[in-house]
């Protein structure tokens, strides 16, 4: 019956029957040796997988760049490439993303990085700083260990490819343009058109090829990864004929690579299309492959061994695969420092831009305020905008933005993504006393209390009777609105079903279809609805928004202790707040009692750190200097305060908290761990196990 159906189908369209099944991963190969191994891979996978797939087929191209283009054109689906090529694949127009990573080390302690090293023969008499004019062996142009890392160290910033080509007297750099840069291919051993080829058709291509170039006395130094010498020389006596060049201009044995390497770089990764990339199918295929044909699994076919050559399809040093988190693109996979180093290596001299700060704004309201600031900043500030806090954190981590102010909950995520606190928000004193200038800037930051606020009229409601009530939260992931109250509830219940504790909630940033968004109002200003959006488009977002939610719909609001005072007794002229009285509200204490809102010091859920400005380490000092200058102009009592107010917003808490008195020094709290403190870090750990973050998964993938 199935055959008859196919015959009928073919009568209408022969192409349909010849097309690959949807459950097929088309693997791209770059040489006849890889094509041969791919054929064995396909044949052996066919034996173990069900007829419906996943299947693997093989596509032949002449180089990794050709494979990247084939994947973009939907002529192939996957290829394993070095981190330097992950950079290339992630750029427009390709926009590919890493979906699976090789891991090394051991299965108990998988490492998704390796060491880039410079190997020389023992007895040669030069150090790393004396390599100019020597003969060099490289794995391939654009490869991490073979090109990007060593040339980034040896050349001044922004030197460009032409300067790199002139640094050595002669080289073998497979994949280089031998017509444009003949010296880069002078030492290569391929014949005819295969000389300097970007595949195993060039004898000195890849890790083992570059080492062979050194072994055969063609070059003076080989730039490879730390396992290359071990793979090619299993006998220690043979390895002892080689040494590593260290960055401190000493030499060490090849076994001592952990103390003598050029850089740690991310492992090779499988890349696929960002849209319709078959990530699930690729992972299913490779997971089955490693289970059946991984290290010491089968004598018939070895996935991580190459009888036809070295490092075919996957590197021979690979022990297995790890799935790359979905939020991780090429920039997050490689990390900002490595990504920026490649950009510097490729940049043409004289094209550097003047130093500025790119501020990340969340939502349109923040962007509007940021643009107003930018116009008056004297050209030192530009603006970028994203929809969520986490999107902004990712943008800063990737170098697409430079700074923003964050709540402690998001500061934790930012820290895990490699960002550092720069300055802290110091809040206005409740006694009305102002601290001007350096007095405020150098005053230790105190933070605030997280409180549970209820209406005084709900006299029977206590902390112990909150189950089944309606709750209002400033946003998911924030200290006062989420981390602390939900951590309390988790400690009480021991359950991660925190969305079932309350009957209805407004927790901006949650699934709009869930009960955690049931109370949310969407846009109050007549703009298109943004129900439960984690920004100011949601009317119940933020501290005042959560209090408004309590007034109009809820039973309890989780906010910071000044929130009620800031929105009552005429301090907030908006219609919902103008008639509110401070005595209309009370605080729920964890011991089951209630107290007036003025007694937060003895009735709170936790004391948490102030919001803080974060940036990357390389930009932190510049951001700090810029902000000190800007708050002298536009801070409270600033010289240009009438033109623009940093700490005042058209809605609430845009860019900075509205009750910020100044941005203050951190004293000694210069890491996110020191800034947040051990108790707060534990509270985050409790809640994070119930509500995982895709960005946090991506930022901790390499073990941060």
Swiss-Prot record:
Residues 1-19 form the signal peptide. PROSITE patterns: TRANSFERRIN_LIKE_1 (PS00205), TRANSFERRIN_LIKE_2 (PS00206), TRANSFERRIN_LIKE_3 (PS00207), TRANSFERRIN_LIKE_4 (PS51408). Pfam families: Transferrin. This is Inhibitor of carbonic anhydrase. GO terms for cellular component: early endosome; extracellular space; plasma membrane; recycling endosome. N-glycosylated. Keywords: Disulfide bond, Glycoprotein, Repeat, Secreted, Signal. Blood plasma (at protein level). The keyword Disulfide bond applies. It comes from the Eukaryota. Inhibitor for carbonic anhydrase 2 (CA2). Does not bind iron ions. Monomer. Interacts (via transferrin-like domain 2) with CA2. Residues 25-347, 357-689 form the Transferrin-like domain.
């Amino acid at each position: 019956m199935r055959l008859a159906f196919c015959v009928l189908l073919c009568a209408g369209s022969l192409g349909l029957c010849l097309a690959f099944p949807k459950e097929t991963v088309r693997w791209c190969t770059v040489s006849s040796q890889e094509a041969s191994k791919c054929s064995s891979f396909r044949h052996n996978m066919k034996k173990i997988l069900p007829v419906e797939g996943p299947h693997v087929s093989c596509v032949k191209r002449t180089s990794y760049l050709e494979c990247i283009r084939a994947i973009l054109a939907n002529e192939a689906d996957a290829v394993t490439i070095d981190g330097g090529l992950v950079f290339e694949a992630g750029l427009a127009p390709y926009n590919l993303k890493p979906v699976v990573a090789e891991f090394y080390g051991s299965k108990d302690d998988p490492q998704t990085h390796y060491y880039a090293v410079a190997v020389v023969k023992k007895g040669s008499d030069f150090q790393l700083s004396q390599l100019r004019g020597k003969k060099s062996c490289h794995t391939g142009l654009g490869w991490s260990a073979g090109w990007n890392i060593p040339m980034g160290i040896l050349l001044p910033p922004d030197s460009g490819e032409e300067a790199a080509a002139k640094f050595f007297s002669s080289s073998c750099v497979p994949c280089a343009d031998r017509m444009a840069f003949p010296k880069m291919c002078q030492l290569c051993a391929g014949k005819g058109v295969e000389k300097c080829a970007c595949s195993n058709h060039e004898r000195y291509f890849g890790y083992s090829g570059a080492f062979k170039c050194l072994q055969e006395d063609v070059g003076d130094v080989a730039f490879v990864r730390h396992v290359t010498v071990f793979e090619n020389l299993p006998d220690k006596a043979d390895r002892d004929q080689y040494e590593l060049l260290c960055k401190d201009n000493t030499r060490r044995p090849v076994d001592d690579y952990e103390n003598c390497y050029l850089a740690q770089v991310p492992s090779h990764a499988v890349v696929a299309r960002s849209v319709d990339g078959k990530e699930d199918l690729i992972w299913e295929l490779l997971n089955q492959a490693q289970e059946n044909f991984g290290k010491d699994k089968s004598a018939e076919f070895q996935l991580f061994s190459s009888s036809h050559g070295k490092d075919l399809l996957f590197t021979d040093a690979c022990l297995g695969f790890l799935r790359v988190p979905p939020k991780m693109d090429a920039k997050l996979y490689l990390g900002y420092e490595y990504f920026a180093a490649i950009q510097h290596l490729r940049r043409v001299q004289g094209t550097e831009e003047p130093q500025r700060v790119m501020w990340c704004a969340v939502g349109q309201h923040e962007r509007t305020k940021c643009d107003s600031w930018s116009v008056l900043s004297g050209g030192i500030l530009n603006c970028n905008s994203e929809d969520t806090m986490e999107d902004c954190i990712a943008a800063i981590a990737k170098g697409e933005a430079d700074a923003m102010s964050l709540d402690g909950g998001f500061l934790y995520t930012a820290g895990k993504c490699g960002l550092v606190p720069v300055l802290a928000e110091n809040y206005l004193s409740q006694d009305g006393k102002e601290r001007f200038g350096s007095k405020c800037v150098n005053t230790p930051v105190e933070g605030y209390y997280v409180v549970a606020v209820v209406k005084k009229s709900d006299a029977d409601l206590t902390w112990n009777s909150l189950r089944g009530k309606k709750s209002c939260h400033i946003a998911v992931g924030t200290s006062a609105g989420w981390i602390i109250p939900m951590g309390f509830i988790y400690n009480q219940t021991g359950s991660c079903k925190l969305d079932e504790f309350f009957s209805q909630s407004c927790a901006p940033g949650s699934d709009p279809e869930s009960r955690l968004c049931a109370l949310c109002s969407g846009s109050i200003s007549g703009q298109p609805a943004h129900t439960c959006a984690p920004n100011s488009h949601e009317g119940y977002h933020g501290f005042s928004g959560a209090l408004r939610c309590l007034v109009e719909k809820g039973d309890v609001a989780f906010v910071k202790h000044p929130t009620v005072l800031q929105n009552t007794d005429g301090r907030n002229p908006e219609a919902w707040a103008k008639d509110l009285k401070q005595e209309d509200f009370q605080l729920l204490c964890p011991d089951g009692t209630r107290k007036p809102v003025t007694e937060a010091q003895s009735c709170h859920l936790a004391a948490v750190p102030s919001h803080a400005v974060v940036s990357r380490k390389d930009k932190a000092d510049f951001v700090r200097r810029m902000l000190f200058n800007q708050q002298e102009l536009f801070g409270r009592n600033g010289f240009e305060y009438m033109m623009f107010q940093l700490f005042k917003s058209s809605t609430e808490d845009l860019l900075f908290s509205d009750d910020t008195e100044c941005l203050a020094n951190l004293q000694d709290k210069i890491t996110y761990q020191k800034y947040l403190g051990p108790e707060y870090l534990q509270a985050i750990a409790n809640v994070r196990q119930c509500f995982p973050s895709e960005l946090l998964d991506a930022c901790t993938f390499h073990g941060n």
